[in-house]
């Protein structure tokens, strides 16, 4: 869907009749987030809570939260937001009442050709 995870009502309507939700919405530019922490919290944490609640309201079978390796021992606001996002997703498995929704997380590492990827660095080192 194209929309804003901060808009709970629209998110809830978008999830009607969905079996699986892949939650990849996030502000991800580390430099931008450091100067806009409140916006990152609204999108990356509160938006995740909206995804959880809308999924439960619609009896979605499975929710997959796309996280990052930056959530491990976070050193910046982006990593901290993803760390919290993972925790509330996992916690939702224990605080969902009678719902059968399964919440899980996946972490990606370095995406080829993305800004900040270490893959080009390793390729250059291998060529040397």
Regions found by a protein language model. Name each.
Residues 16-17, 59-60, 99, 127-128:
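Short loop/turn elements that form and flank the Walker-type P-loop nucleotide-binding site
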Residues 23, 27-87, 91-93, 101-103:
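Conserved Rossmann-fold NAD(P)-dependent oxidoreductase catalytic core, especially the SDR/UDP-sugar
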């Amino acid at each position: 869907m194209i929309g804003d995870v901060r808009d709970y009502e629209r998110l809830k309507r978008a999830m009607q009749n969905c079996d699986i939700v892949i939650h990849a919405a996030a502000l991800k530019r580390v430099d931008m987030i450091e100067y806009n922490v409140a916006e990152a919290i609204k999108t990356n944490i509160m938006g995740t809570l909206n995804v959880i609640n809308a999924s439960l309201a619609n009896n979605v079978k499975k929710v997959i939260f796309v996280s990052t390796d930056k959530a491990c021992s976070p050193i910046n606001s982006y990593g901290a937001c993803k760390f919290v996002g993972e925790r509330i997703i996992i916690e939702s498995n224990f605080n969902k009442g009678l719902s059968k929704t399964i919440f899980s997380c996946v972490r990606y590492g370095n995406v080829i050709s993305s800004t900040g990827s270490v893959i080009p660095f390793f390729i250059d080192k291998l060529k040397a």
